[in-house]
């Protein structure tokens, strides 16, 4: 009788993300096997999107 609702709260104690080998940030997901910051393990190219950078104010 220990696999019920009370045991579900004890699942979040392990480290989900570890340090990435490519970018060095603490964003490499251990179970998924790729970095959330740079995309290492998922693609050869560096993960970058335009919505991450702040847009220039051209008025």
Swiss-Prot record:
Binds 1 zinc ion per subunit. Pfam families: Ribosomal_L37e (PF01907). One of its GO terms (molecular function) is zinc ion binding. Zn(2+) binds at residues 20, 23, 35, 38. One of its GO terms (biological process) is translation. One of its GO terms (cellular component) is ribosome. Its cofactor is Zn(2+). PROSITE patterns: RIBOSOMAL_L37E. Keywords: Metal-binding, Ribonucleoprotein, Ribosomal protein, RNA-binding, rRNA-binding, Zinc, Zinc-finger. A zinc finger (C4-type) spans 20-38. It comes from the Archaea. The keyword Zinc-finger applies. Binds to the 23S rRNA. Belongs to the eukaryotic ribosomal protein eL37 family. This is Large ribosomal subunit protein eL37. It comes from Archaeoglobus fulgidus (strain ATCC 49558 / DSM 4304 / JCM 9628 / NBRC 100126 / VC-16). The gene is rpl37e.
